[in-house]
From Swiss-Prot:
<dbReference type="InterPro" id="IPR016039">
    <property type="entry name" value="Thiolase-like"/>
</dbReference>
<keyword id="KW-0808">Transferase</keyword>
<dbReference type="InterPro" id="IPR020610">
    <property type="entry name" value="Thiolase_AS"/>
</dbReference>
<dbReference type="GO" id="GO:0005737">
    <property type="term" value="C:cytoplasm"/>
</dbReference>
<dbReference type="InterPro" id="IPR020617">
    <property type="entry name" value="Thiolase_C"/>
</dbReference>
<dbReference type="GO" id="GO:0010124">
    <property type="term" value="P:phenylacetate catabolic process"/>
</dbReference>
<keyword id="KW-0443">Lipid metabolism</keyword>
<dbReference type="InterPro" id="IPR020615">
    <property type="entry name" value="Thiolase_acyl_enz_int_AS"/>
</dbReference>
<dbReference type="InterPro" id="IPR020613">
    <property type="entry name" value="Thiolase_CS"/>
</dbReference>
<dbReference type="InterPro" id="IPR020616">
    <property type="entry name" value="Thiolase_N"/>
</dbReference>
<comment type="subunit">
    <text>Heterotetramer of two alpha chains (FadB) and two beta chains (FadA).</text>
</comment>
<dbReference type="GO" id="GO:0003988">
    <property type="term" value="F:acetyl-CoA C-acyltransferase activity"/>
</dbReference>
<keyword id="KW-0012">Acyltransferase</keyword>
<keyword id="KW-0963">Cytoplasm</keyword>
<dbReference type="GO" id="GO:0006635">
    <property type="term" value="P:fatty acid beta-oxidation"/>
</dbReference>
<feature type="active site" description="Proton acceptor">
    <location>
        <position position="343"/>
    </location>
</feature>
<comment type="function">
    <text>Catalyzes the final step of fatty acid oxidation in which acetyl-CoA is released and the CoA ester of a fatty acid two carbons shorter is formed.</text>
</comment>
Length: 387
């Protein structure tokens, strides 16, 4: 089997979905911008040698429909001989795109792939056109399709208080703001034009979604968003709604060395897992356990973790059962997470992987873990190794 490596990884800034920076920018343009960026940043790469593009996207309709991966690649001017496909594992879509490309390279069906994902939640809302089969109610609770209620359930089962959630959410914004001020996102963000609140075109090189003024006290005044009577999950302790894209250049290790490209990380192991849809947010636990076993590692071997923050009430139980709760400030989401940056569904898997690789380099650690929950009860995880 071929070793598979990450040569480059980038993302757009995260734009606010409601009247945000990308309100006049389409999903295909966000995607094409990154595809072009990967090629221009790596001039040794002949675009004709790219085998396939795997692009995550959840709401594959309207501007994100009809194979947005191919549409974006054509906009980007990538040679017509390069194939492209759109991948959907809901929240884990772009991490699944990475897994698909990795397997193709491992078995020799490809040497070079571009992977990534996009979601413009302002143009194509998360619930647009969703129509669950009525028969699902025989085996799955209706509330399992309501992500906020699954977070309420998981938090209650694990004794996660409102105070704990508000503290975790405030931490996300504070750390993301600090990362912005200190330039820790600079290496991963590829600036792109958008419009400010006055409609003026400007170059965005920072995340619009972060709220640096967020405090635990301010969050404590918010009403529960999903269970008005008994709930603890608020809009403030949930992932923000944002628009964005992310991308990676993935290669066989020997091809990267042939081209003289810097290898940033190796894909050490991958896993997906299912769990009860009513506690869909628990998926990272079984997925991570599988990935660690396949890598021959324990959680103590992992030096840096990116755990997608769908909800604080979901992230904390996962951290607890993975043995990370007392190590959060040492190695979990040190630049904040989706509560501050947002969770553009199809984008997030490669976004957290990109942030992870940059963090692994910054803190000089050998192994890193990126993992996330997936709607209707799944989890996905990837272990990376610095070479």
């Amino acid at each position: 089997m071929n070793n598979v490596v990450i040569v480059d990884c980038i993302r757009t800034p995260m734009g606010r979905s409601k009247a945000g920076a990308f309100r006049n920018v389409r999903a295909e343009d966000l995607s094409a911008h990154l595809m072009k960026g990967l090629i221009s940043r790596n001039p040794q790469l002949d675009p004709n040698s790219i085998e396939d593009i795997y692009w995550g996207c959840v709401q594959q309709t309207l501007e994100q429909g009809f194979n947005v991966a191919r549409n974006a690649s054509l906009l980007a001017g990538i040679p017509h001989t390069v194939a492209a496909t759109t991948v959907n594992r809901l929240c884990g879509s772009s991490m699944q795109a990475l897994h698909d490309a990795t397997r193709a390279i491992m078995v020799g069906d490809a040497e070079t792939c571009i992977i990534g994902g996009v979601e413009h939640m302002g143009h194509v809302p998360m619930n647009h056109g969703v129509d669950f089969h009525p028969g699902m109610s025989k085996s799955v609770a209706k509330a399992a399709g309501m992500m906020g209620l699954t977070a309420e359930m998981l938090g209650r089962m694990h004794g996660i208080s409102r105070q704990m959630q508000d503290e975790f959410a405030a931490r996300s914004h504070q750390r993301a703001h600090a990362a912005t001020i200190e330039g820790r996102f600079k290496n991963e963000i590829l600036p792109i034009e958008g419009h400010d609140e006055n409609g003026i075109l400007k170059l965005y090189d920072y995340d619009e979604v972060i709220r640096p003024e967020t405090t635990v006290e301010g969050l404590s005044n918010l009403r529960p968003a999903f269970d008005p009577v008994n709930g603890t999950v608020t809009a403030g302790s949930s992932s923000a709604l944002s628009d964005g894209a992310s991308a990676m250049l993935v290669m066989s290790e020997h091809r990267a060395k042939e081209l003289g490209l810097t290898i940033r990380a190796r894909v050490k192991s991958m896993a997906v897992a299912g769990c009860d849809p009513s506690i869909m947010g628990y998926g990272p636990v079984p997925a991570t356990q599988k990935a660690l076993k396949r890598a021959g590692l324990s959680i103590d071997d992992i030096g840096m973790v990116e755990l997608n923050e769908a909800f604080a009430a979901q992230s904390l139980p996962c951290a607890k059962d993975l043995g990370l709760l007392d190590k959060i400030d040492e190695k979990v989401n040190l630049n904040g997470g989706a509560i501050a940056l947002g969770h553009p569904l199809g984008c997030s898997g490669s976004r957290i992987s990109t942030t992870l690789i940059n963090q692994m380099e910054h803190h000089d650690v050998q192994f890193g873990l990126a993992t996330m929950c997936i709607g209707l009860g799944q989890g996905i995880a990837t272990v990376f190794e610095r070479v």
